[in-house]
A protein has these predicted regions:
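Beta-lactam-recognizing serine transpeptidase/beta-lactamase-like catalytic domain environment
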Residues: 83, 89, 235-242, 287, ...
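Periplasmic/cell-envelope proteins involved in peptidoglycan metabolism and beta-lactam response
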Residues: 1-322, 425-433, 547, 556
């Protein structure tokens, strides 16, 4: 019996020993496996860390909001706002957020319908069909005054719900307005509507400028959008990063809004007065006016007819009937008509300067010594030049005239004789000196190139020299003539025309001053002084009498050029003076 018990004890002891050994082996295997997994995890983390981080981040809830920049202002020289960007709001509904609490649906949709005039049935249908929508724009570009009733309603509903829920049981709690937010952006506004429209230009929906200062200085006026990033971690912690927007720079222009308004007033008055003079039912095809400081190149006013409303640049109703506009849209000429309206006539269109160019011919003759000012000329009403008999503006002739009298009476014959004395080579040289045929580089978009519209030595023959001497046969822009004439009367200094005097940042600090630039000297002080005397006489005693304002002594020159084809009897009439 004792032996039997000893055998049982021995067997039990052996079993336990074997069990411990096996358990030890299993633990070792598990530890080795765990160690291997740890090593593998280290390698995975090291080699694929960025990839796994991205996967984790994509599972988190994000929001990203664009923070719009504010486009810079444009002011006149005295601080009058000509163009400004104003904050507006888009009404956005986030259905998913609203439906997070079913109790929010009713007050939210009711408030939207009430405050913004939206159809409640349309709202219900959209939410029903798009419960996960997070960005549904209900209204665009509303002012703060237009969204204020909703903001007030939101507070009112929240207050009522808070008061009611104090005593209501959990199953009967009232909901609040939720899931509506206001997306901020800026819209461009022009407080003076059509004032200085050719100078200012306008912006499109992409915030980029079209024509004028808006286009030329587009990069200065535009800033950089900011962005606000946010996401919720698994523990509902909100992480948020904000990159602030950088607002655009503002422009201080050389324009004087008061002078600009006066110029536009009288341009419109002229076209109303002579509405049926050339063609029934309309004024001139174009009328332009530049008021420029000859002593520094600053543009004080630049206006033209027809004009347009900068706040509604596609509106043609002032000039065309609904039927005419519809016809344009049907035959694809609508945008051609708009572009013609938007063009700045003073810098983009060319014309024959006519007798205003006689000032350049006489100044060239005096400066080069080809004429002295003591000459006399006999005008019998015309002059034979090569194979052409070229008439004077007075068919019976002016008789005997000196240089001053030739300018006063605008005698073509006398100017043709001066042109002959000057010669082709010198005439071409001085047209270049006065920058005719070259861009002035005024800081406005759309300046025309006229190099192909003036003569050169190979294209100017005897007849071309004769007609050029009194301003026909070649084309220039108004700004070319204004800059050239300014140098004739200011002592001979050719200033680059400019419309902006200063660029400032969003805090009003000066970023850059735009100083007057003298590019060259066209004539001497002596020649300039003599030309001022001639121009004064042309207004006091000559063809420019009607341009003389009461109480002021001015000098200037009239101009009349026949448009091509000459036999149609259409004319460009002009006056240039100071």
């Amino acid at each position: 019996m004792a032996n039997k018990n000893r055998r049982r004890y021995k067997k039990g002891k052996t079993f336990k020993k074997i069990l411990r050994e096996k358990l030890g082996v299993m633990i070792i295997i598990i530890l080795l496996a765990f160690g291997g997994l740890c090593v593998r995890l280290v390698y995975i983390t090291r080699d694929n860390q960025e990839s796994y981080q991205k996967k984790i981040l994509t599972q988190q809830r994000y929001d990203s909001t664009t923070l719009p920049f504010k486009r810079g202002n444009i002011t006149d020289r005295n601080g009058t706002i000509l163009a400004v960007s104003e904050k507006v709001y888009n009404v956005v509904l986030d259905c998913k957020v609203m439906l997070d609490d079913e109790r929010s649906k009713e007050p939210t949709l009711s408030a939207l319908a009430e405050c913004f005039g939206l159809s409640r049935s349309d709202l219900d249908a959209y939410v029903e069909n798009n419960p996960n929508s997070q960005y549904y724009v209900l209204k665009k570009r509303l002012t703060y005054d237009e969204i204020s009733p909703f903001l007030d309603k939101e507070k009112e509903v929240a207050a009522e719900a808070a008061e009611f829920n104090k005593t209501a049981d959990s199953d009967n709690q009232k909901g609040v307005i939720n899931g509506v937010w206001f997306e901020e952006e800026y819209t461009r506004r022009y407080p003076n509507n059509s004032l200085a429209c050719d100078v200012i230009g306008f912006t499109g929906t992409d915030n980029n400028g079209t024509y004028g200062l808006e286009e030329y200085y587009n990069d200065e006026l535009n800033g950089t959008n900011g962005r606000e990033y946010g996401y919720l971690n698994d523990d509902a912690t909100l992480e948020r990063t904000t990159i602030a927007a950088v607002d655009g720079h503002s422009l201080v222009s050389t324009i004087d809004a008061n002078i600009q308004a006066i110029a536009e007033k009288y341009i419109l008055q002229f076209n109303e007065e002579y509405r049926d003079a050339a063609r029934e039912g309309a004024g001139s095809y174009n009328t332009g006016c530049i008021i420029m400081n000859p002593n520094n190149g600053e543009i004080l006013a630049m206006a033209s007819y027809p004009s347009y409303d900068l706040n509604n640049p596609k509106d043609l109703s002032a000039y065309y009937t609904e039927e005419e506009i519809k016809e344009m849209q049907d035959n694809n000429t609508y945008y051609d008509t708009l572009n013609q309206l938007w063009r700045n006539f003073c810098i983009s269109d060319t014309y024959e300067p006519g007798s205003t160019a006689k000032t350049i011919t006489i100044a060239t003759g005096l400066e080069t010594g080809k004429i002295t000012g003591n000459e006399t000329y006999q005008c019998a009403g015309g002059l034979q030049v090569a194979d052409h008999y070229i008439r004077c503006n007075v068919r019976s002739g002016h008789g005997t005239l000196d240089v001053s009298g030739a300018l006063e009476q605008s005698c073509n014959v006398a100017l043709m004789e001066m042109g002959e004395a000057i010669g082709v080579k010198t005439m071409i040289k001085y047209e270049n000196i006065f920058n005719l045929g070259l861009k002035t580089n005024i800081d406005l978009a759309g300046e025309a190139r006229t190099a192909s519209l003036v003569y050169n030595e190979s294209t100017m023959g005897e007849s071309e020299l004769a007609t050029s001497s009194f301003g026909q046969g070649f084309n220039v822009t108004m700004i070319e003539m204004a800059a050239a004439f300014s140098s004739i009367v200011n002592g001979g200094y050719y200033y680059e025309p400019h419309v902006v005097s200063k660029i400032t940042n969003s805090t009003g600090d000066t970023v850059r001053n735009i100083e007057p630039r003298v590019l060259k000297q066209t004539i001497s002080e002596t020649t300039s002084a003599q030309m001022r005397q001639y121009l004064y006489a042309a207004v006091a005693e000559g063809t420019g009498k009607s341009a003389r304002p009461a109480g002021y002594a001015i000098g200037g020159k009239t101009g009349t050029a026949e448009k091509v084809p000459r036999d149609h009897k259409h004319y460009v009439v002009s006056f240039i003076g100071c």
